[in-house]
Curated annotation (Swiss-Prot):
<keyword id="KW-0690">Ribosome biogenesis</keyword>
<comment type="similarity">
    <text>Belongs to the UTP25 family.</text>
</comment>
<dbReference type="GO" id="GO:0019843">
    <property type="term" value="F:rRNA binding"/>
</dbReference>
<dbReference type="InterPro" id="IPR053940">
    <property type="entry name" value="UTP25_NTPase-like"/>
</dbReference>
<keyword id="KW-0698">rRNA processing</keyword>
<feature type="compositionally biased region" description="Acidic residues">
    <location>
        <begin position="159"/>
        <end position="183"/>
    </location>
</feature>
<feature type="compositionally biased region" description="Basic and acidic residues">
    <location>
        <begin position="127"/>
        <end position="136"/>
    </location>
</feature>
<comment type="function">
    <text>DEAD-box RNA helicase-like protein required for pre-18S rRNA processing, specifically at sites A0, A1, and A2.</text>
</comment>
<dbReference type="Pfam" id="PF22916">
    <property type="entry name" value="UTP25_NTPase-like"/>
</dbReference>
<feature type="compositionally biased region" description="Acidic residues">
    <location>
        <begin position="77"/>
        <end position="87"/>
    </location>
</feature>
<feature type="compositionally biased region" description="Basic and acidic residues">
    <location>
        <begin position="102"/>
        <end position="118"/>
    </location>
</feature>
<keyword id="KW-0539">Nucleus</keyword>
<dbReference type="GO" id="GO:0005730">
    <property type="term" value="C:nucleolus"/>
</dbReference>
<dbReference type="Pfam" id="PF06862">
    <property type="entry name" value="Utp25_C"/>
</dbReference>
<comment type="subunit">
    <text>Component of the ribosomal small subunit (SSU) processome composed of at least 40 protein subunits and snoRNA U3.</text>
</comment>
<feature type="compositionally biased region" description="Acidic residues">
    <location>
        <begin position="137"/>
        <end position="151"/>
    </location>
</feature>
<dbReference type="GO" id="GO:0032040">
    <property type="term" value="C:small-subunit processome"/>
</dbReference>
Amino acid sequence: MARQVKRKSGADRNDGGGKYNSNNDRSVKRGRSELRTVTRTSRRDRGQDEQHNSHGTGGDFDIEGNVKDGRENVEQDKEEEEEEEDEDKGKAYEALLTLLKIEQKQEMKSGNKMENGRGLENTGSETGEKDNSAVKDDEDEDEDDFGEDENAGVVLEDQKEEEEEEKEDEDEDEEEEEDDEDTPAGINNDAFELHFNQPTEEYLEQEDKLVLKENAKWNIHKKESYDDLSLTSITQSPPGSSITIPSSLLKQKGTDISEYPLKKRVYTAFESTYGPSISKLESILLQPILNYQDINYQYKTFLNSSYRKLYALHALNHIYKTRDRILKNTAKLHQLNEDGDDLELRDQGFTRPKVLILLPTRDACNEIVEMIIKLSGTDQQENKKKFTTQFYTKAETRTNKPGDFQDAFKGNNNDFFCIGMKLTRKTLKLYSSFYSSDIILASPLGLSMILENPDKKKRQYDFISSIEVLIVDRANQIEMQNWDHVNTVMKYINKVPKEFHDADFSRIRMWSINDQAKLLRQTLVFSEYQTPAINNLVSSKSHNLAGKIRFKPVITSENSIMNSIGLRIKQVFQRFPSESPLADPDSRFKFFTNSIIPHLLQSSSYGNGIMIYIPSYFDYLRVKQHFKDSTKYNFGAIDEYSSQSKLTRTRHEFALGKIQIILYTERLHYFRRYEISGVKNLIMYVPPSNPLFYKELIRFIGKSVFKEECDLDLTWAKLIYSKWDANALERIVGNERAPVLCSSQNEQYEFR
């Protein structure tokens, strides 16, 4: 017989995606009221159930209000057994689990949540997938909340049990690799060995001083052009000297995947999934990735997604190489101990996780996990059903939106998750505890909530102390969410841990102990287009001694976004003087308020219909306040934080001409993709980050012309820029025009 337990979400709640929860959980949820239903199998007889139901309606009761009744209906022996179970489970050494278990354990010891607290745990650990209704969402939940209350990322087994299972799995026989990595020829051709095990302490000390302490300038080592791919690359090397990469590894390989130094199981899985060949572009990307060089790659459009299989391949190859190296060294040490000899073999970090993948949404995470499963060569996957429930949904975006919008917000677009993945000989396990995981997949928001818990005693960052490969995918989507969370992750990654988690110091590499891990961490960043924040991630916050490569698409006037608008609207580019990037916001505001606003209506042939597009929210607030305090214009302002009623009302009044001027932010456009009616003239306060937005904004005017609300010859769009906007301008007008706009004597240019 089953009974239902309803509880309100609180500080002890555990949300899906492995995300961390704190006492300010409701603020994270943007104030949404949540009520979850948990059903578990009752072990009492019918009489006890009837007695219990007499205290409530249909067996439903509130945990906090009916604790006493719950205690009276629990058998003493069952209570003691479950308490012992909880104590054993509470030993699991995992960041998210620890935070949850401390709260639950304290409440159980004080008698506040006796049976019900254990019931929730037993639902996850005992019934598991046997009872599909064990943990479910309330039917009235929004789609955005689907699966948020699942214990994603939480491990309820004892850590010792995990280690024993892993040891048993490691002891099983495995087919030997064809190439022995321990031979001199193998070492000289193995980028993994050269990058992580060969650098000497003296070399790393020297580079630590130059790169980290003195912040010496990196050198441009090589520039290459791939005309047939409309692509260029710039390779930078660190000050001093970079890690020596043999010519055999630097020589450009072909499109046959067998030419690349991959573990046999990864190569076999890749070949069976994607075939034996890769494209020329993929070969150009894969080689430096496998050489552990940093990559900053602009894939230009969401349709170009083939690079993802390359970093999934690399992540698995790295994990398997690490694992095999540790196993071989362990066997060597065991043999030497039997012979009475002594040897120092260092092959580990402080903690197990080696790869961190940052992604914007759960749907993006689901896509990568599915790809990794295909390439892993594992026979079985644990907790796959649970993962699919929390990370995958068939919900589709509206088809009247642009393709890139549909791609960004398809499926489960929840941006709050952090999940561990553990790989053994035959099994890929999802929801592994962070400290026993090989790969961590997270949104910056989900991970930062673990790293910077408001309660300092509960903060956990040790599990990312030994990350050797950092991958940031769909960086533009992450930036539109909140780039501050990425900065938080970069603050803690490769930081020496607070505790050492039973680490074997005789096996830890010296560069980890000496706090030099960041000098060898590889960073891979993939984005549609480059922004200062994304570029800074590789140029300033990555210190990989193997070098950095920036790939950049070639945008000409012919394939630029301006050339694809299809409307002969007057487009004016107005340059203002700016001394430095730091002074740019103030210089822009001064120019705008002194030169643009006073003649705003006079410059228009119409008394209304002026849109001012502002990418930065801080610039938007500044301009909005100026309009309010220093002008008499009848204006409206809408942004990503505006209520739906205000958005609807302001757009309607602007379309009718009741509002002369409307202020419109870039993030609002990104998240909603409105087609604003009534736009007759357009001012872009800063060049749009996404070149597609430039085209969409210009077409607002085209829509008004089509409706015969204005004349094509009397409309215009004006873009305000400085020389520091060169990259954004290049995406709009092409690489031939952008230098002219930024450095010539004329300050104003007109295009049609």
